[in-house]
């Protein structure tokens, strides 16, 4: 049954009240130093409207959460976030409900070491690391039982080093059959502030977001994730 005009107006009014409260809260937390612009859109799909907005406004990134007040909201937030990661062209930063804000000092890049010249957006990565003056950790998860240090591994690692030598990245090779668990444990142990992934088909992003139990892990983690797409 289509919504009535009265129902639509009520939804818009409710959204306006909530977004105004959020704007005021953010303004206080930022000390009034950040210009905050709010906008409400009525759309058939969240991702479709976000894609249109990104196309016209060219934001640096889209920031999304993974949890709402109700079970339905949590499901919708999680689904929309995953769809945004897969389909939006601009970077998507996922901020879990348990995340605490502090200066970004350590950034991890989850990498499968496959054709890195074509599959890693080095310019965006360099800009991010330089802007925050952060340490960069290159993380490669290798399934147990597979040969970890192959000729390809050496070649691809050298390619990354050639591109990012002045940033002095740290390399970590981890043997694990549970990609998401290994990343979570490394992030906690080494106090990473942000984990970057580069979504592509059959890559690490699918292992993180495809299965239901890993979706739950991501939604419960304290570590913000940033999906950066290739240009």
Task: Give the ranges of each region predicted by the language model.
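Short secondary-structure boundary segments
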Residues: 66, 140, 198-200, 229-230
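Charged helix-capping and loop-helix junction motifs
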Residues: 77-80, 152-157, 209-214
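Residues at the starts of beta-strands that form the adenosine-phosphate
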Residues: 35, 105-106, 133-137
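Glycine/threonine-rich flexible loop motifs
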Residues: 71-76, 205-209
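Intrinsically disordered or low-complexity boundary/linker segments at protein termini
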Residues: 61-66, 86-121, 219-231
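Acidic, proline/glycine-rich short linear motifs
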Residues: 1-17, 137-159
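Anionic-ligand binding region
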Residues: 119-126, 160
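Structural beta-alpha unit
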Residues: 24-62, 164-215, 219, 223
